[in-house]
Structures are given as structure tokens and as C-alpha cells.
């Protein structure tokens, strides 16, 4: 007997190029089922995935993201569509009982397909962003069932001009498909245009009645004390008789330690005509003071489990549906002060600091594990919004699930871009896809797929463009707000809000319209190049209230370059000086192919890497690039935060990550190693933040929370390269109001007598009563007209450190707590926030000339001491985790979650860190946690 429910078909798939298969789909699923053998052309398939992903998995082609290997892979424009038309085949078992019904579900296929089940053919219509459900009840076998699909690429894969370009020749825009696949200024072309069964395939077994696309909506009254849950679901009766059934809804809240409380249980009786469909709306369910869902930085992400079941008389449970749901309300208007779009969550304004997202992987190798890491990384950076760019995907439910979990609001665009749809060079087609009804069908289906996620904040018609007029008008109508979400009132005359397609979120026609950029669609987003850090704070930097795209550099660490390129890609750029004194960087061919963006902008910005001296090699270049990365992105967010609500309502960085091994605009690379910009962003976007305005040199406190800060003070200390503290000051603050920026006082050290050319500044915001640090911010600065070249000899300083590490292993996961203490001393006034390490951990063993270790096996505790006779700042320290067993050149274990990284410690200061990661499968030795820094060029082990 088949159990009621869903079975995912994600293993056992094989594939072959259609031109190399001599039999048809009927034969494949009856008399001639294929198998992998030395004589056949069949291979293990990546499902979900793409043709290119399958070929890479089987090493039939090189890794397109390594070096220049993509140039060795045949492009569909040269081969024709048949070359990337593939058969996919698998077997499944499903024994059903009388009055059970079985459906075969495809959550997405690119671009069209014919499906064969046990010799029966079904034509699947076109479109990359639509679901397909096939009733296979009457064609199933009691034992093994054979399933084959022939999947065809997009109808208009286009060609790639020699110069590349934004979306190639723009032909892909004639289809309802992802547009980035023809290449952009940040990615190479994807040779198969993402052809494949790229999302979940499943078999679902139900009784006579099945549940289709429930819609959950919450409304609030009395200042969020009273709430109602509105639910509408479509019910389909597959049987040939009128069916009486009960529809049950259960709402469960998790209290703690896995203990759950059923908050509501409601049953309603319905009659469904034979082979008919009805839309059933539940009586609204009342809640008193529900636990609200909040975005990252505003509160907890409280979720309730909503379970809907349908029980058919004389049959039993027929179907069930479950969805985590967050009670929250999103409002969005154009702000009267700034002209920017303002968002409110549960009545509170939220200052948007987020970034643009393309997709997790350019070959659509999507997984829950990768999505979890991607989204947690964004939360770790203290971001609160992700924009799903219109040239990419309608993101998957797993993406949204983790945005729900970690509190990331999502701006979801439909599949229109200015470059491809009317504003490109050469001028592209302004009429969008050829089939407008197909576009709208995919859009409506996407809304139904995603609308129950609390993280989903708004729909947008396109990137830097609006959809064609008829599509745009249809979307405006389909996605119109229910009256409650416009007037805040719910009348008995109003229809239930859950009967709308959405009705709860705004639809904005394009990314530069209606409160974004100049609001009129002119190209007023950007810029996308390196900037002087102080410029981000200037009132003249950006005119408008909300910038949907502003970007900069994105160089990863040297280990990533070596892991993703052969040795000829390890050469650093040439620095060519022009007649105007500006430096032009000339990268090698591989870096250019991987879309490297230079750290100079001749005529505007002097090379920021050369501010630290000419790099000697790849390691030196990448380390200095990380220094620039940290400053650049911290300044970007701090500059916007400095004018919160007075000039700006939000900003989204272009872009957060790369779906391939690109070298442009990223906080972490495709291998999932964070750059220093990740931690610069994390610092700048913390909910309560102390910062230095780099334009005015005023110390500021940014309070984005709803709570007033009182009984707080700021400690400012300057440290020179000799380890002295020539400046120390405590600023007493009476209060910092909620949702406000408070300018405290001018930082006057640069105007003092004989200030140092290069110096360090440490700011700490703390509560006076208990000295608890609320915000810590460390700067390295130079006087006007100077640079950071004095930091080069500072590398020779031997600053002593003491590192204490305590590790806990749960399954394959390691959870480490590490304390790093700069044990050097300097003459300074008493540090009111200074933390001292007081543990005495016994016998030491010498490991290196500067490093000694002790361990307590009973407590899982390890202590490492780095010897040093110099006093000063331990500068720009970085953790990394390594596999001691691997023979690969790249020994890193990735991903790793660090509570902070790329940090510096002043004399006498200590900081604690949390490090979390999963050990690789089969690894027997303990992983090694390493530490290195500006003063510690040779990384040393602190654990393992």
C-alpha cells in the first residue's frame, strides 16, 4: 500500500544525449529501459540539475568555472539545440489501493519536455518557471514503473557576441527563462542555457480529494494584540461521486526543547462534486497576542506550523499539507522626507541594508545545505533584505524557507531586465517574451508557490525595466492589495484576503520606479567601481532615498585563486601609471575572463591596494585586497546608515555573492569562503553601531532598534605603530533614541600636535553600569594626503598572543569557542572596557619558534601562546579551518561560520569567537583551526 504523502525522486536518474539514443520514449519505458554500461552512452544524471551539471558530474566536460575551461565547452549557439537536448530516465515503485490517486510532479523544467511513463506520453508545455502535475493513476504498474523525459533547451538560446555583453544578443528574452545564461559583465555564458530538470521531481499519493495551493494571510487589530489567520485552499475531487469530507486545520507552536503546543484545531465539513474543484475558505482563526515574525535585527523569527488535512467519509485521510507560517504585516510606501521607499514590519519602520542575489550556482546545483549556508551568511552579515534579481531565478521554496528561518526579507523580481528587454546595447526587444500569456501563467504559478513565506516582502516587475504594458497591467491587477492592506480596516463586506492571488504585498513595476533610485526609471542606480571610503558619507554621493544597486570590488583570498585557476592565473595585475598620475590595473587573461574589477578607477580613484605598498605576489596582493575590501564595504553601509531617515531609507549592495568563480562584487566566494568585506559589512550593519563618519570625522551612534539606549558611553582610543596610546577619551551619552542616528562629538586626534601619519582607532560603545560592550569598531586610518605604506614594516612586529580554545563535537559538527588575547602592554589611561584573561592553564610545549601549546584533555581545552617582545596592535587576524588529511593543494574546510573574523586587538584586549563547521565525510583526524595575520604571515594552529 502506498502511504498518503509525497516521495521525492532525487536519485537513480541516468541521462544521455538525445542524438545518441536510438529508441523512443515509448520503448525506453516499456521494452528497452536503458542502463549504464561500457557500451551505452548513458551516465549518472544530476536531478534536480542541468545537462551541464550532469556532464560535469561525469567528467565528460571540464569544470566550466575553473580557469578558462568554459572556453573548451561547446556553446549551444555553435552546436544547435539538439546537442543539449537530453533524455533523463529513472525507475520508481508505487503500489496504490483502490480510491488512491497518484500524481507525478515537476516543480520546474527548462524549457520544454515530453514525459513517458510506462509507455504513455504527455507533452509538457514550455516555460522555466512553472509547475507540472500529471495524473498517472491509471498507468502505474504494481511493481516497478519506468519514467523517461526528453528535455529541450530554450527555444531562443541566442548567440554570444565576441565582446560578451549583457545577456549576449538578447535572444533569450524571447523565452520565459533565466536571462543571465547568455553571460553578463559578472558571469561567463552558460553553454547549455540551464537546460534540464532543474527542480524537485516527486510522486504524491492521495485519496479521492487532494489539497491544492492553500493561501495563508494574517490580519491584525488593537496594536497587534488581536490577530486572525485567514486560509483558503482549493480542493479537487478525483472520484466519480460527490464526496463528503471534513477539512481540518491545526496550528502548532514550538515552545522550547522540541515541546509543541497546539494553539488551534478547527474542522469544517464540505461537499465536493464528482471530479470537481472548489475553493474553500475557512472561518478566520482568532489569536490573542501571537508571537510575531520579525526580520533579522528586529526580533525573533517566530514560526507556527500550519497543518491542513482532508478526511473523506468512508475512506479516511485523503491528503495533507503543511507550511511554517509567520504572523507579520508588511507595509510599504514612498517616504515623504527622503522620496525613498519605506518598509514597515509589524508597524515599525525598518532601515533596509541588504544586497542583490543572482542564484546559488550557475549550473543550478541547488541544495538545502547550500541554501542554508547562503542565507545564514546573509544573516551573519546583519543584512535584512535580499533582492532576487530579475535576470536570475524565481527562487525556490527552500531558499525562502531559510529566509523565513533567518529573517531575510526578499524582494522577488520577475524575468525582465533592461539589457535584454528594450534598453540594451544594441537595443533589445521592448516587447519582452514572445508569449505574454506564458509569462503571466509562470508569474501566477510562482506567486502561488511562494506567497505563504513571511520573508517575501514585495514583487517587482523587472530589473531596470518594466514589463510590456499588457503584462504590467495584468500583474498590477493580479497582485493588487486587498483593501485591508490599504486602509487597515477589515469590513464584513470585504472578501476574505486569502482568496486573493496575493493581496498582501506591493507590486512595483520596476527596480528604478516608485521609490527606488529616482523613481522614474532613469538609470540612477550604481555606481559599481571602487570608491574613496569617505565619499560614501558625503551628501553629494547619491541623490535618492533608496539605491537598489551599488557595488564595488570582490577579490577573494589567495587560496581561492589557486583552487579555481591553474598557475598561469596566479599572476597579479600589472600596475600602469598614466600621465595623469592614476594607476590602471591590467589583469591576466583568466582574471579578466572571471570579470575581475580593479581596485583603481583612473581619473577618479587612485589604486587602493597600492595605498599599502606594491604587492610582491599573489598572497600579498590578496591580503592587501582584503584590507581594502573591509574598509570599502564597511564605509558603504556606514555612509548610508549615517543618513538614515534624513536622506535614505535603504540600500542594496550589488552584489552579495557569485554563482560561479567570479572576481567581481561578492562577500563570499563560490567555494563559500568569506572575504574581509563580509565582516566589514557585519560590523557596519549591526543593529546598534558606533562609527566614525569618515567625511566629518564625527563619532556617531546608529540605533536601528525600537529601544532607546540609555546609560551608555563611548570609549575612543588611538594606537600608534609603536604600541603607544597617544589619545584616549570617553564620551558620555545620555541616550540614543530608537531609530535614530546620534552625532556625538568630533574625533580631534588628526588635528592634534604631531599626529601619527598612520594610526589605529578603537571605538567601543558600552553600558556604564556593567561595562558590557554593545558595539566595537576598529579602524586603521591615515592623515589626509598620506597612505598606509608604513604598515609594511609593521609586519615585522612580533606581538604576543594567547589563544584559548574549547571544542565540542556533535555528530560531524564542531562547535568551538576561541578566546584571543593580545598580551602586550602599553602605557595608557585605565581602559574602562578592557577584558583580562585570568586563566592559568599549566604546562607548555614548544611547537614553533614563537608558538607554544598546552592542553587539558579532560576539559577539551587547548591553549596556544605566540611569543613576542613587541607591544602594539595585533593587526588583521584571520581564522581558517583545514583538513589535515587531504592531499589537495587547497586544504580548507568550507563552509565555516565565524562569529567574527579579520579582526584586530589592541594591547591588553581580548575577544571571544564562535566557530562552527561540519567535518568532511570520512575524516579521521581532527580538523585544524589556523590563525594568521598581518604580524603573523605563517599561520599557526590553535586547534587540532
Swiss-Prot record:
Active site: 464 (proton donor), 549 (nucleophile)
Statement: the UniProt record of this protein carries the keyword Kinase: no
Keywords in alphabetical order: Glycosidase, Hydrolase
pH-dependence of activity, as noted: Optimum pH is 5.0.
Family annotation (InterPro entries): Beta-gal/glucu_dom_sf, Beta-mannosidase-like_N2, EBDG/EBM, Galactose-bd-like_sf, Glyco_hydro_2_AS, Glyco_hydro_2_cat, Glyco_hydro_2_Ig-like, Glycoside_hydrolase_SF
EC identifiers of the protein: 3.2.1.152
One of the record's GO molecular function terms: mannosylglycoprotein endo-beta-mannosidase activity
BP GO terms, sorted: carbohydrate metabolic process
Changes after translation: The mature enzyme is proteotically cleaved into 3 subunits of 31 kDa, 28 kDa and 42 kDa.
SUPFAM superfamilies: (Trans)glycosidases, beta-Galactosidase/glucuronidase domain, Galactose-binding domain-like
GO cellular component entries: plant-type vacuole
Record-stated family: Belongs to the glycosyl hydrolase 2 family.
PANTHER family on file: MANNOSYLGLYCOPROTEIN ENDO-BETA-MANNOSIDASE
Subunit note: Heterotrimer of 31 kDa, 28 kDa and 42 kDa subunits.
Reported function: Glycosidase that specifically hydrolyzes the Man-beta-1,4-GlcNAc linkage in the trimannosyl core structure of N-glycans. Does not hydrolyzes pyridylamino derivatives sugar chains containing Man-alpha-1,3-Man-beta or Xylose-beta-1,2-Man-beta.
Name by which UniProt lists this protein: Mannosylglycoprotein endo-beta-mannosidase
Name of the encoding gene: EBM
Amino acid at each position: 500500500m502506498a502511504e498518503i504523502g509525497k516521495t521525492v525522486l532525487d536519485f537513480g536518474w541516468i541521462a544521455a544525449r538525445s542524438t545518441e539514443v536510438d529508441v523512443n520514449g515509448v520503448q525506453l519505458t516499456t521494452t528497452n529501459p536503458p542502463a549504464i554500461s561500457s557500451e551505452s552512452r548513458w551516465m549518472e544524471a544530476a536531478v534536480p540539475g542541468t545537462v551541464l551539471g550532469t556532464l560535469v558530474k561525469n567528467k565528460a566536460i571540464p569544470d566550466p568555472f575553473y580557469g578558462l575551461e568554459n572556453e573548451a565547452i561547446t556553446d549551444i549557439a555553435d552546436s544547435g539545440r539538439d546537442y543539449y537536448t537530453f533524455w533523463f530516465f529513472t525507475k520508481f515503485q508505487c503500489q496504490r489501493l483502490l480510491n488512491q490517486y497518484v500524481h507525478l510532479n515537476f516543480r520546474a523544467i527548462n524549457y520544454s519536455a515530453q514525459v513517458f511513463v510506462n509507455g504513455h506520453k504527455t507533452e509538457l508545455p514550455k516555460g522555466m518557471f512553472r509547475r507540472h502535475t500529471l495524473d498517472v493513476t491509471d498507468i502505474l504498474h504494481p511493481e516497478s514503473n519506468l519514467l523517461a523525459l526528453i528535455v529541450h533547451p530554450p527555444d531562443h538560446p541566442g548567440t554570444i557576441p565576441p565582446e560578451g555583453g549583457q545577456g549576449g544578443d538578447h535572444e533569450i528574452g524571447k523565452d520565459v527563462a533565466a536571462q543571465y545564461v547568455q553571460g553578463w559583465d559578472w558571469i561567463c555564458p552558460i553553454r547549455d542555457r540551464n537546460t534540464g530538470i532543474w527542480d524537485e521531481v516527486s510522486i504524491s499519493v492521495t485519496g479521492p480529494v487532494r489539497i491544492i495551493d492553500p493561501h495563508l494571510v494574517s490580519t491584525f487589530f488593537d496594536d497587534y494584540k488581536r490577530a486572525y489567520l485567514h486560509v483558503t485552499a482549493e480542493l479537487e475531487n478525483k472520484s466519480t461521486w460527490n464526496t463528503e469530507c471534513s477539512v481540518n486545520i491545526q496550528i502548532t507552536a514550538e515552545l522550547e526543547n522540541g515541546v509543541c503546543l497546539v494553539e488551534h484545531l478547527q474542522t469544517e465539513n464540505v461537499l465536493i462534486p464528482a471530479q470537481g474543484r472548489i475553493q474553500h475558505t475557512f472561518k478566520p482563526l482568532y489569536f490573542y497576542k501571537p508571537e510575531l515574525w520579525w526580520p533579522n535585527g528586529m526580533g525573533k523569527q517566530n514560526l507556527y506550523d500550519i497543518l491542513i488535512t482532508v478526511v473523506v467519509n468512508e475512506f479516511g485521510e485523503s491528503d495533507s499539507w503543511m507550511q511554517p507560517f509567520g504572523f507579520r504585516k508588511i507595509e510599504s510606501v514612498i517616504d515623504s522626507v527622503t522620496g525613498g521607499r519605506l518598509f514597515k514590519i509589524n508597524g515599525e519602520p525598518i532601515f533596509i541594508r541588504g544586497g542583490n542575489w543572482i542564484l546559488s550556482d550557475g549550473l543550478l546545483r541547488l541544495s538545502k545545505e547550500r541554501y542554508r549556508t547562503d542565507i545564514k551568511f546573509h544573516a551573519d552579515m546583519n543584512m535584512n533584505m535580499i533582492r532576487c534579481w530579475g535576470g536570475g531565478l524565481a527562487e525556490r521554496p527552500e531558499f525562502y524557507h531559510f529566509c523565513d528561518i533567518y529573517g531575510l526579507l526578499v524582494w522577488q523580481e520577475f524575468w525582465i531586465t533592461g539589457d535584454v528587454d528594450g534598453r540594451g546595447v544594441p537595443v533589445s526587444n521592448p516587447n519582452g517574451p514572445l508569449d505574454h500569456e506564458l509569462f503571466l501563467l509562470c508569474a501566477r504559478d510562482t506567486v502561488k508557490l511562494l506567497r505563504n513565506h513571511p520573508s517575501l516582502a514585495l514583487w517587482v516587475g523587472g530589473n531596470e525595466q518594466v514589463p510590456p504594458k499588457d503584462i504590467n497591467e495584468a500583474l498590477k491587477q493580479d497582485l493588487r492589495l486587498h483593501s485591508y492592506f490599504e486602509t487597515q480596516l477589515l469590513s464584513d463586506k470585504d472578501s476574505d484576503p486569502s482568496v486573493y492571488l496575493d493581496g498582501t504585498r506591493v507590486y512595483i513595476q520596476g527596480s528604478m520606479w516608485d521609490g527606488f533610485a529616482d523613481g522614474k526609471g532613469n538609470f540612477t542606480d550604481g555606481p559599481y567601481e571602487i570608491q574613496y571610503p569617505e565619499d560614501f558619507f558625503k551628501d553629494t554621493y547619491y541623490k535618492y532615498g533608496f539605491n537598489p544597486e551599488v557595488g564595488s570590488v570582490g577579490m577573494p583570498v589567495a587560496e581561492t585563486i589557486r583552487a579555481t585557476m591553474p598557475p598561469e592565473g596566479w599572476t597579479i595585475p600589472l600596475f600602469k601609471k598614466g600621465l595623469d598620475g592614476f594607476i590602471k590595473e591590467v589583469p591576466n587573461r583568466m582574471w579578466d575572463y572571471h570579470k575581475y574589477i580593479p581596485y583603481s578607477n583612473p581619473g577618479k580613484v587612485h589604486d587602493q591596494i597600492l595605498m599599502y605598498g606594491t604587492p610582491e605576489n599573489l598572497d600579498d596582493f590578496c591580503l592587501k585586497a582584503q584590507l581594502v575590501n573591509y574598509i570599502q564595504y564597511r564605509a558603504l553601509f556606514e555612509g548610508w546608515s549615517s543618513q538614515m531617515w534624513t536622506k535614505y531609507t535603504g540600500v542594496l549592495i550589488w552584489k552579495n555573492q557569485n554563482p560561479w568563480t567570479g572576481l567581481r562584487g561578492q562577500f563570499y566566494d563560490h567555494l563559500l569562503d568569506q572575504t574581509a568585506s563580509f565582516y566589514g559589512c557585519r560590523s557596519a550593519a549591526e543593529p546598534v553601531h558606533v562609527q566614525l563618519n569618515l567625511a566629518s570625522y564625527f563619532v556617531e551612534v546608529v540605533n536601528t532598534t525600537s529601544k532607546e539606549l540609555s546609560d551608555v558611553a563611548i570609549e575612543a582610543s588611538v594606537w600608534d605603530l609603536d604600541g603607544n596610546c597617544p589619545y584616549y577619551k570617553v564620551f558620555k551619552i545620555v541616550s540614543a533614541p530608537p531609530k535614530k542616528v546620534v552625532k556625538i562629538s568630533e574625533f580631534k586626534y588628526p588635528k592634534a600636535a604631531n599626529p601619527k601619519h598612520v594610526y589605529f582607532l578603537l571605538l567601543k560603545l558600552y553600558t556604564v553600569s556593567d561595562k558590557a560592550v554593545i558595539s566595537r569598531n576598529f579602524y586603521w586610518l591615515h592623515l589626509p594626503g598620506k597612505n598606509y605604506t608604513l604598515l609594511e614594516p609593521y609586519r615585522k612586529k612580533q606581538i604576543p598572543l594567547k589563544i584559548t580554545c574549547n571544542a565540542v563535537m556533535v555528530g560531524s559538527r564542531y562547535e568551538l569557542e576561541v578566546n584571543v588575547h593580545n598580551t602586550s602592554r602599553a602605557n595608557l589611561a585605565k581602559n574602562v572596557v578592557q577584558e583580562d584573561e585570568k586563566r592559568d592553564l599549566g604546562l607548555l610545549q614548544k611547537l614553533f619558534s614563537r608558538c607554544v601549546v598546552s592542553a587539558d584533555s579532560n576539559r577539551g581545552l587547548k591553549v596556544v601562546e605566540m611569543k613576542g617582545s613587541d607591544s602594539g596592535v595585533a593587526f588583521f587576524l584571520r581564522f581558517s579551518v583545514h583538513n589535515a588529511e587531504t592531499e589537495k593543494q587547497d586544504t580548507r574546510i568550507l563552509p565555516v561560520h565565524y562569529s567574527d573574523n579579520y579582526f584586530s586587538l589592541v594591547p591588553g584586549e581580548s575577544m571571544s569567537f564562535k566557530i562552527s563547521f561540519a567535518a568532511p565525510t570520512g575524516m579521521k583526524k581532527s580538523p585544524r583551526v589556523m590563525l594568521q595575520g598581518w604580524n603573523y604571515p605563517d599561520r599557526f594552529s590553535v586547534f587540532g
